[in-house]
Amino acid sequence: MTSAVGISVPNTDAQSSQSASQTTVEQEVLKSKVNLLGMSRIELEQFFEQIGEKKFRAGQIMKWIHQYFVTDLAEMTNISGKLRTKLEQVCEIKAPEVVHRHYSKDGTRKWVFRVGEGSGSLVETVLIPAEDKTGSRKTLCISSQVGCALDCSFCSTGKQGFQRDLTPAEIIGQLWVANQSYVEDVPVAERTRAVTNVVMMGMGEPLLNFKPVVHSMSIMLDDYAYGMSKRRVTLSTSGVVPMIDKLAEELDVALAISLHAPNNPLRDELVPINKKYPLEQLIAAAQRYITKDGNESARKHVTIEYVMLDGVNDHPEHAQQLVKLLKNLPSKINLIPFNPFPHAPYGRSSRNRIMAFQKTLSDAGFVCTIRQTRGDDIDAACGQLVGQVADRTRRAEQWKKKVAERQEIIRSQG
């Protein structure tokens, strides 16, 4: 039978054969294996019904994958041997390949993943630990695209260009790997979920990969998976206004705006999408978002992200303009010291200037924090490590090409 999700299901009761035709069938089944990692509970329920099993198996599998971080079906003790045999032939549980992992002395962790077939493309994820009033907080910054099409002038990811959207398995796989890194040496029965917060602030614009991102966040919120609070899952956007309204209709998560400028001329320069959706439209969309459905818990305020660029957007008048812009929008402001990257056209604002900027906002009644710089020793700024890895890869390929050319010259001369 062929399911709606394109799964070829073999008859496990049929007698096995060593014929060439049977081998061909097995190869076709392997090609059609579906990855369960990125499937929602509803999709898993449909999957199990399509292979002739009960829907409750979906919850069992989700817990094994996302709460105990088990990918080997043989370790799933409440799944029968017969069902495991069937599943092994039609599905897999596969996270993105980790090509680099770096753990900073300050607790920050960073992974570079290869996604796609063959040599694939590179994306990265950063985990930032912190202490708060609830105890130890671990915030994971997740990527949604390979590269980014928005080309914000201060962002290293945008300089790499846009390649493609990530799939749900590639998005949720980042969360899976981060959690699994804390429990890989822990007995299965004692494993817990380490990541407490997720921010969709990594490589790419999440709202331009809308369906896979919303799908992945729904898995984060599912009690059979990560069971995260709506207030602890945040989507950050540079300002794709129509999709902010669509997000409000589909999912209740916290919203962050990558603002970075308090007026349209400057934001046009720093965040080019502002030319299409200027500040007036963006702020109005943010106001609609937090008032949707009676101001639910995840939507009491919007987080405003503001990177501090020396001599560009950090003057006293910029702080005053920001106060005026946000006066009717319940918001928390996060000032971000700029992380320079190779050939960056900007520098980081001085500590004194950042503190003065913060004081103006705080005096106006805003909650305003300064993001602590972490992971400097592992290039934890978004896009930096992927850029370095890609650069090393290009240099290695160029060197191999030169060696091959020299060898060809030597052979021709000999």
Curated annotation (Swiss-Prot):
Compartmental location: Cytoplasm
Which prosthetic group or cofactor does it need? [4Fe-4S] cluster
Q: What is this protein called?
A: Dual-specificity RNA methyltransferase RlmN
Q: Which CDD domains match?
A: Radical_SAM (cd01335)
Start-end of Polar residues biased regions: 1-13
Annotated cofactor note: Binds 1 [4Fe-4S] cluster. The cluster is coordinated with 3 cysteines and an exchangeable S-adenosyl-L-methionine.
Name the predominant localization: cytoplasm
Provide the species name. Acinetobacter baylyi (strain ATCC 33305 / BD413 / ADP1)
Q: Where is this region: Disordered?
A: 1-22
Swiss-Prot/TrEMBL catalytic activity? adenosine(2503) in 23S rRNA + 2 reduced [2Fe-2S]-[ferredoxin] + 2 S-adenosyl-L-methionine = 2-methyladenosine(2503) in 23S rRNA + 5'-deoxyadenosine + L-methionine + 2 oxidized [2Fe-2S]-[ferredoxin] + S-adenosyl-L-homocysteine; adenosine(37) in tRNA + 2 reduced [2Fe-2S]-[ferredoxin] + 2 S-adenosyl-L-methionine = 2-methyladenosine(37) in tRNA + 5'-deoxyadenosine + L-methionine + 2 oxidized [2Fe-2S]-[ferredoxin] + S-adenosyl-L-homocysteine
GO MF terms listed in the record are: 4 iron, 4 sulfur cluster binding; metal ion binding; rRNA (adenine(2503)-C2-)-methyltransferase activity; rRNA binding; tRNA (adenine(37)-C2)-methyltransferase activity; tRNA binding
Q: List the disulfide bonds.
A: 141-382
UniProt keyword annotations, A-Z = 4Fe-4S, Cytoplasm, Disulfide bond, Iron, Iron-sulfur, Metal-binding, Methyltransferase, rRNA processing, S-adenosyl-L-methionine, Transferase, tRNA processing
Q: Report the EC number(s), separated by commas if there are several.
A: 2.1.1.192
- Biological role stated in the UniProt entry: Specifically methylates position 2 of adenine 2503 in 23S rRNA and position 2 of adenine 37 in tRNAs. m2A2503 modification seems to play a crucial role in the proofreading step occurring at the peptidyl transferase center and thus would serve to optimize ribosomal fidelity.
Q: Which GO terms describe its cellular component?
A: cytoplasm
Q: Which family does it belong to?
A: Belongs to the radical SAM superfamily. RlmN family.
The UniProt record gives the binding positions of [4Fe-4S] cluster as 148, 152, 155
Tree of life domain: Bacteria
